[in-house]
Regions:
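Short, flexible, mixed-charge acidic loops at enzyme active sites
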Residues: 73-85
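Active-site beta->alpha N-cap acidic-glycine motif
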Residues: 1-64, 108, 115, 191
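Catalytic domains of cell-wall/extracellular-matrix polysaccharide-remodeling enzymes
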Residues: 89-164, 187, 191
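Active-site groove signature of glycoside hydrolases
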Residues: 1-4, 66, 70, 84-86, ...
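Hydrophobic faces of well-ordered beta-strands that scaffold small-molecule active sites
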Residues: 24-26, 65-68, 116-119, 141-144, ...
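Active-site beta-loop-alpha junctions enriched in small/polar residues
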Residues: 1, 29-31, 70-72, 146-147, ...
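Catalytic grooves of carbohydrate-active enzymes
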Residues: 3, 19-20, 112, 137, ...
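The substrate-binding groove and active-site-proximal loops of carbohydrate-active enzymes
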Residues: 1-5, 37-46, 87-96, 179-185
Length: 194
């Protein structure tokens, strides 16, 4: 989520989560430069006056927060280790650049007293340099993994994501991270989640 996103859609989805007492993991983009994540001025009118105070409040309610990149801008045409997309904010960039981007994103969150050791890669794309940079910056886990259970690899815990939500919801066992882009969610999708 971002300070400049479509808050009306977010609050509608949050009401659904609250109704069913779901405490989600959310990805926070500390310096959003992705126009696709920005809501209209009308949809931002209900935005919290202090974005980071709001995020801290969600954490106090039991929500988990992940660093969701730095700017959420796809500047490479690399998919990295997770073959879902062929573009990335991180994959394909030199280690030092990735390390600096991750450090800066974490610093922005911590300057606002938001602390996390979870990472959510924009476009689910990362490479070995990303993993190394995450560990160097104190991260313990990321959301973009395979399978049905969290697992340890390269010194990090990976939480599996759902490739096809309908298939994931039919499973009788296992764990998965559902990806919901609340800023662009449509009415029929809201009804489906209900």
């Amino acid at each position: 989520i971002t300070p400049d996103m479509d808050w009306q859609r977010f609050f509608r989805f949050k009401a659904l989560l609250d109704r069913y007492q779901v405490k989600p993991l959310i990805g926070v983009v500390p310096d959003n430069r992705d126009e696709n994540l920005r809501g209209s001025s009308e949809s931002r009118k209900d935005a919290p006056a202090d974005f980071y105070a709001y995020i801290r409040g969600l954490q106090e309610e039991g929500w988990s927060v992940a660093l969701h990149g730095m700017n959420h801008v796809y500047s490479t045409k690399k998919g990295g280790l997770f073959p879902l997309n062929d573009f990335s904010e991180y994959a394909g960039k030199p280690y030092e650049e990735q390390k600096e981007m991750i450090a800066r994103g974490k610093q922005i969150l911590e300057e606002h007293d938001v602390h996390t050791d979870l990472f959510m890669a924009p476009a689910h794309s990362y490479d070995r340099n990303t993993l190394r940079a995450l560990k160097e910056n104190g991260f313990q886990a990321l959301t973009d993994g395979f399978g049905e259970q969290p697992y340890l690899w390269q010194g990090l815990t990976f939480y599996p994501i759902s490739f096809r939500l309908s298939d994931t919801l039919k499973k009788k066992k296992g764990y998965s991270t559902m990806v919901v882009h609340t800023g662009t969610i449509q009415e029929n999708e809201l009804a489906g989640y209900e």
